[in-house]
């Protein structure tokens, strides 16, 4: 990944006399001296390639021709390295990020003030940050830093550069697309392993374990917490207990994904635990599958995610009426209450702006579903789409989803 080029593109979008600060984040404590696993701020990672705690990226733009960049790291501690592993060293940080100017976090505020007061002269600096981020560490640390600076110098302005970062991150380059393809390929293998080992009376978390094992073998992480829901549990959108056993004739809804080099895949497949769909299951599944294909045919530059979702609702209105599921009381939203798509990338629900049109290079999900709680049927079919010049490419097309293909595959192992 060309992190330097990404920083250059961001700097081109920023005002003169601006200082941009990004923070990598820090893992909070869960209980006692035990920490949650660290998850780097994805925008910090996007511009540096470094996945370490408590680092700062600082970009300074004085003019179109004059800018500089600095990375602030923690000093290496030999004693702590023996207990929890070493902090990143200057040479390693320089090699990964291509940032030559490596400094220590202890000098962060003083160094920024130096640029403001020595170089700003009569110009008022603008402090730029990704201030719409939901990560608590990012919002608290950078916002508080800016608050302190403005208190010390009220002439400073603050600019939220969430949109600029979104524009860059939403348009995936070829390297990013290939990494996402890899994540999807591993997800495919995991789903097929689940299908091959599915049987009635199997526990949901036992099926889930086959996916977990696949990820471990392929040196991948989970993109998000796996949903492995059987029967009525599949009508709960974000079901996560995964601790019930599957009865004969149950469907299994598995919403899961591998993460490779931090890039997520997000796939959902629904299959019969015993390898055979009932006629009613086939009827509902076919409607969802056709909705999935409708979105794939429609997705292209210029459309919004809301337009794709509205098309699915209109399609369901006609199809559900035809099979008697809609009346004066029941509406489509009684059977389908989520959106059909979200952005995908370094985050499973990747950085996005509501109503922003799709552009070439965006990767989105395509996940229509129907949930008939009274019948114990929950079906969702989710694929990952790459927006191209005039349409889209289904990156997950190799993962089977036709009824006949699923039954044929599963019954090889019965």
Question: Where do the language-model regions lie?
Answer:
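Active-site neighborhoods and metal-handling regions in enzymes and metal-associated proteins
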Residues: 1-414
């Amino acid at each position: 990944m060309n992190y330097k080029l990404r920083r250059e593109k961001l700097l081109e979008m920023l005002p003169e006399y601006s200082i941009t600060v990004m923070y990598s984040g820090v893992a909070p404590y869960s209980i006692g001296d035990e920490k949650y696993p660290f998850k780097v701020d994805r925008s910090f990672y996007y511009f540096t390639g470094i996945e370490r705690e408590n680092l700062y990226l600082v970009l300074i733009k004085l003019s179109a021709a004059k800018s500089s960049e600095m990375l602030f790291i923690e000093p290496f501690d030999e004693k702590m390295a023996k207990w929890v592993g070493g902090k990143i060293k200057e040479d390693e940080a320089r090699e990964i990020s291509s940032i030559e100017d490596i400094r220590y976090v202890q000098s962060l505020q003083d160094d920024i003030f130096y640029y403001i007061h020595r170089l700003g002269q009569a110009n008022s600096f603008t402090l730029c940050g990704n201030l719409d981020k939901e990560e608590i560490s990012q919002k608290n640390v950078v916002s508080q830093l800016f608050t302190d600076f403005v208190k010390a110098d009220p002439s400073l302005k603050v600019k939220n550069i969430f949109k600029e970062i979104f524009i860059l991150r939403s348009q995936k380059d070829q390297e990013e697309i290939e990494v996402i393809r890899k994540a999807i390929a591993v997800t495919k293998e995991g789903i097929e392993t689940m299908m091959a080992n599915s049987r009635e009376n199997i526990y949901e978390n036992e099926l889930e374990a086959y996916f977990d094992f696949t990820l471990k073998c392929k040196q991948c992480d989970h993109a998000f917490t796996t949903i492995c829901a059987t029967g009525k549990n599949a009508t709960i959108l974000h079901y996560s207990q995964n601790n019930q056993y599957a009865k004969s004739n149950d469907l299994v809804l598995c919403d899961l994904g591998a993460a490779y080099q931090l890039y997520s895949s997000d796939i959902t497949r629904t299959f019969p635990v015993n390898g055979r769909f009932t006629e009613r299951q086939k009827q509902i599944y076919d409607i969802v599958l056709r909705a999935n294909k409708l979105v794939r045919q429609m997705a292209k530059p210029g459309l919004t995610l809301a337009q794709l979702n509205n098309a699915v609702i209109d399609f369901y209105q006609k199809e559900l009426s035809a099979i008697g599921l809609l009346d004066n009381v029941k509406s489509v939203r009684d059977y389908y209450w989520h959106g059909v798509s979200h952005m995908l990338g370094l985050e499973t629900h990747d950085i996005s702006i509501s109503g922003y049109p799709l552009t070439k290079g965006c990767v989105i999900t395509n996940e229509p579903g129907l949930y008939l709680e009274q019948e114990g049927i929950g079906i969702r079919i989710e694929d990952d789409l790459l927006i191209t010049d005039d349409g889209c490419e289904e990156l997950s097309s190799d993962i089977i989803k036709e009824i006949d293909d699923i039954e044929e595959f599963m019954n090889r192992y019965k």
